[in-house]
Each structure stands twice: as structure tokens, then as C-alpha cells.
Curated annotation (Swiss-Prot):
Reaction it catalyzes: pyridoxamine 5'-phosphate + O2 + H2O = pyridoxal 5'-phosphate + H2O2 + NH4(+); pyridoxine 5'-phosphate + O2 = pyridoxal 5'-phosphate + H2O2
Free-text comment on the cofactor: Binds 1 FMN per subunit.
Highest taxon, organism lineage: Bacteria
Signal peptide: none
InterPro entries listed in its UniProt record: Pyridox_Oxase (IPR000659), Pyridox_Oxase_CS (IPR019740), Pyridox_Oxase_N (IPR011576), Pyridoxamine_oxidase_dimer_C (IPR019576), Split_barrel_FMN-bd (IPR012349)
Key words, A-Z: Flavoprotein, FMN, Oxidoreductase, Pyridoxine biosynthesis
Pathway: Cofactor metabolism; pyridoxal 5'-phosphate salvage; pyridoxal 5'-phosphate from pyridoxamine 5'-phosphate: step 1/1; Cofactor metabolism; pyridoxal 5'-phosphate salvage; pyridoxal 5'-phosphate from pyridoxine 5'-phosphate: step 1/1
Subunit description: Homodimer.
Gene transcribed to yield this protein: pdxH
UniProt family annotation: Belongs to the pyridoxamine 5'-phosphate oxidase family.
Name this protein carries in UniProt: Pyridoxine/pyridoxamine 5'-phosphate oxidase
GO BP field: pyridoxine biosynthetic process
Length: 221
């Protein structure tokens, strides 16, 4: 293919990493949750846009993968929380194959976190509590959008939103849709990546063993 113009070949793009502080076994926290909390706090303080954006990877029963960017809505020692329409592409894949991965691409700080694990639905009380905290426009949007369904045009979505706005007019409380809710990814592996010079990056992974303990492993970059 003859490509002309100002296109820059991806192979010519270079970025040298030179972290002031490497990631070592001595400065790593004692557990994945504390380490993630430390880095997440630093990302927020640094003012990165959408610091809670993460790439969610799923696969169907046949092993065909898909990925998309979603927003982290909570984390604790039990795992990472997100919300979606259960009938969406990711929702149906998680129902069929309840294992997933998360990637937090914090490249402005020369960092990345990769998480793998099993995914469970949140109980209804947790979903409803979070839904009640959402802006009203987002609540209406959850009712209006049959996520991942093919639409004939943009007007169909706008019309559905207006219909929901009329249905719940005058400040009527908006309940969580029955097909909308949360998932918690319970990690069995959490890798922390810190960029370093000469592509000799630091990769330290917390991995859950069959016995339920956690071990720390250094991975080759």
C-alpha cells in the first residue's frame, strides 16, 4: 500500500522511560490492595484525565476476546467494581465466561496495572445504592439505552431518552433498571509495571496461589 502525506509510521515512534524511582521488592507494598491504593492516589493527585478509566477484557464461551474502556467505580481488598447493562456485549460475555482482565494505562506516570481474576455480580442492594448516587441524566440514560443493540439512527436513542425523561418527570425517583447492575472482579493476579530506561521496565506481580496465599514475582520486561 502506498501511503502518502504526513502519516508517521508507528514503528518510528519512540518514548524513552526514565522513572525517578524504580519499582523494587523493597518499596513495593505488602499486598496488592495497598500498592494499588498508593498508585491510584498518586494518579489522582497528578491530575491525569479519567484516572479511573480501565480497559476491560472479556471473552465468550469460544474464547473470542473483546475489550473496551470502562470506569472503575470502587475498589477494596475484595476487588474492583464496575457497572453496566447486563444485556450489553460485556455483560453477556461475563455471564457466559466469568473471567476478565483490567488494564489501567497510566502512561503519563510511566505506569500500568494489569489485573486478572473471576467476576461476580454485586448484590442488588449495592447496585441500587450506587445507582441512587448517579446524576439524574445518567440514571435516565441507563433506562433509555439498550446497550450494544444496533440502532437505526441517533434519533432513536434521543427519542428513548426523552420518553424516559417524561416518564420520570417532576423529580420522580428513578429506580435502577432490572437489567443494569454491578460486577466485582476478584483478582488472582495484579501486576504493577513501572517504565525504565532501555526498555528494562520493572514488573512486579502479586499472584494468588492454589492455597489462597499471595506471592510476589518479578517478571522479565
Amino acid at each position: 500500500m502506498d501511503v502518502t502525506g504526513d502519516t508517521v509510521p508507528p514503528a518510528n515512534l519512540r518514548n524513552e522511560y526514565a522513572a525517578d524511582l524504580g519499582l523494587t521488592e523493597s518499596n513495593l507494598a505488602g499486598d496488592w490492595y495497598t500498592q494499588f491504593d498508593r498508585w491510584f492516589t498518586e494518579v489522582v493527585a497528578a491530575g491525569l484525565p479519567e484516572p479511573n478509566a480501565m480497559v476491560l477484557g472479556t471473552a465468550d464461551r469460544a474464547g473470542r476476546p473483546s475489550a473496551r474502556t470502562v470506569l472503575l467505580k470502587g475498589y477494596d481488598p475484595d476487588g474492583f467494581v464496575l457497572f453496566t447493562n447486563y444485556g450489553s456485549h460485556k455483560g453477556t460475555e461475563l455471564a457466559a465466561n466469568p473471567y476478565a482482565s483490567l488494564v489501567f494505562p497510566w502512561f503519563m506516570l510511566q505506569r500500568q496495572v494489569v489485573v486478572t481474576g473471576r467476576v461476580d455480580r454485586l448484590d442488588r442492594a449495592e447496585t441500587e445504592a450506587y445507582f441512587a448516587s448517579r446524576p439524574r441524566g445518567s440514571q435516565l440514560g441507563a433506562w433509555a439505552s439498550e446497550q450494544s443493540r444496533v440502532l437505526p439512527n441517533r434519533s432513536a436513542l434521543d427519542d428513548a431518552y426523552r420518553a424516559m425523561a417524561e416518564r420520570y418527570a417532576d423529580g420522580v425517583p428513578i429506580p435502577a433498571p432490572p437489567n443494569w447492575g454491578g460486577f466485582r472482579l476478584r483478582p488472582d493476579g495484579v501486576e504493577f509495571w513501572q517504565g525504565q530506561a532501555s526498555r528494562l521496565h520493572d514488573r512486579l506481580r502479586f499472584r494468588s496461589t492454589d492455597g489462597g496465599d499471595w506471592v510476589v514475582e518479578r517478571l522479565a520486561p
